[in-house]
Amino acid sequence: MGCLGNSKTEDQRNEEKAQREANKKIEKQLQKDKQVYRATHRLLLLGAGESGKSTIVKQMRILHVNGFNGEGGEEDPQAARSNSDGEKATKVQDIKNNLKEAIETIVAAMSNLVPPVELANPENQFRVDYILSVMNVPNFDFPPEFYEHAKALWEDEGVRACYERSNEYQLIDCAQYFLDKIDVVKQADYVPSDQDLLRCRVLTSGIFETKFQVDKVNFHMFDVGGQRDERRKWIQCFNDVTAIIFVVASSSYNMVIREDNQTNRLQEALNLFKSIWNNRWLRTISVILFLNKQDLLAEKVLAGKSKIEDYFPEFARYTTPEDATPEPGEDPRVTRAKYFIRDEFLRISTASGDGRHYCYPHFTCAVDTENIRRVFNDCRDIIQRMHLRQYELL
């Protein structure tokens, strides 16, 4: 009996030793995970719908992951290539859908605008009828006649005139880009370029995380849908955020949001920025402000058809600040416009600032890879300081 008791105690002793070793391993792994977690910079991309948030994420993949070779930059080249091929095939369909939506939206708007727009060539009416007839066809297979009709309509001066009034209806930003490329997109062996993939518009629904590394520093970037019904999901991402990148479509000063076809898009962005800046959960989180779509803003300002003061009367009294630094060769009208928009946001951050968080504005063009590379490099020091402050190391 005594021997049996000692044997049992030995078993217990071995079991306890094994348990202690297992606990040590778990504790070591937890400490390692904690170190990795604390060393990771978590960036939350916020902004109103169609401001360019998802395009910023795509640029991070081009610059810091592995381009569009799979979601996570796989180490296995074959797996990466397989993912890349599958993703690009999906994107071809998305690009074709963008092209179809663009021509449908423009020709459908022609009769609805006040005053309406007529075709320059009335013989193209049968082409309009065709485009409208396939508008709601599910799983559309893009036959050759679709491209033929779309191209002929895009070359019609009446359709172009309707496109010029696109601020009066809801049209995706990439409409002209893909309509100009009909002959390329229609090819059976068409493979999208990085620029095509950057321009492609797909509505973001839910929360998407992109992980990348820059100079051995880990970044997690969270892209959240910007439409009003998506914003209730944002609160899920607020915990342990290093910084917020707030993206604004600067060119949207003469447009209205899709959700109600009434609210000015830039005013919506200003209201949203104010609510985030004053949010009690975010009072210590600084905001990097991406004043995006500078290329489209410049086009609108120089075209002179939609004046900012018609939508924001205070612009008439605005003068370009002395510390403004225009881009080389930039028209003074463009400089004045972009700094006015910048200062509208800075008025919000300075009016309610308590010194616990700051706003860092940058002028961006999300489809320009070099611009985003330069801006993100400029932001890295800011993000690093925020991260050190977050863990009270600064």
UniProtKB/Swiss-Prot annotation:
One of its GO terms (biological process) is sensory perception of chemical stimulus. A lipid is attached at residue 2 (N-palmitoyl glycine). GO terms for cellular component: cytoplasm; heterotrimeric G-protein complex. Residues 288-295 are annotated as: G4 motif. Residues 364-369 are annotated as: G5 motif. Keywords: Cell membrane, GTP-binding, Lipoprotein, Magnesium, Membrane, Metal-binding, Nucleotide-binding, Palmitate, Transducer. Residues 219-228 are annotated as: G3 motif. Heterotrimeric G proteins are composed of 3 units; alpha, beta and gamma. The alpha chain contains the guanine nucleotide binding site. Interacts with CRY1; the interaction may block GPCR-mediated regulation of cAMP concentrations. Interacts with ADCY6 and stimulates its adenylyl cyclase activity. Interacts with ADCY2 and ADCY5. Stimulates the ADCY5 adenylyl cyclase activity. Interaction with SASH1. This is Guanine nucleotide-binding protein G(s) subunit alpha. It comes from Cricetulus griseus (Chinese hamster).
